[in-house]
Regions:
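Class II aminoacyl-tRNA synthetase catalytic cores and aaRS-like
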Residues: 1-136
Length: 136
């Protein structure tokens, strides 16, 4: 009924059925109880990939029963440091201690806050688990 009203009143075609998900699914996939699914920024659990790496932030989180999750922001490998710092501050506003980032540069090298603590194989496994490629 609401879909018909929208179409009749303002010409907006509502695609049915409307996607629904449980609170638990929303929190697990997007980290929010009101996710914006338009952009595909789903959390990827990489806990198994980083479980034995030398980066204390990751291993500490796992030892305390937490998880390590990431978001692949396609095509943003060359995001300016100022913007990354703004994202860190945004995350801190929601209770995070910080953010770790890994960019795969167009030439295949890595720009990261933690790459020096991981082997090349671990970094490749992490990029693969995240569905990353050069430029991400």
């Amino acid at each position: 009924m609401v879909a018909n009203v929208c179409e009749e009143a303002i010409g907006l075609k509502v695609q049915l059925p409307i996607q629904r998900m449980t609170y638990a699914e929303a929190m697990d996939r997007f980290g929010s109880d009101k996710p914006d699914t338009r952009f595909g920024f789903e959390l990827v659990d990489v806990s198994e990939v980083v479980a034995n790496c030398g980066f204390g932030v990751f291993t500490g989180a796992l030892e305390n029963g937490g998880s390590v999750r990431g978001i692949n922001i396609k095509g943003q490998a060359e995001m300016p440091r100022k913007k990354i710092d703004a994202l860190v501050e945004f995350a801190k506003g929601y209770g995070a201690k910080g953010l770790a980032y890994l960019s795969v540069m167009p030439d295949g090298t890595y720009k990261s806050s933690f790459a020096k603590f991981m082997t090349e194989e671990e970094l490749q496994a992490l990029v693969s688990a995240m569905g990353g490629e050069a430029g991400d």
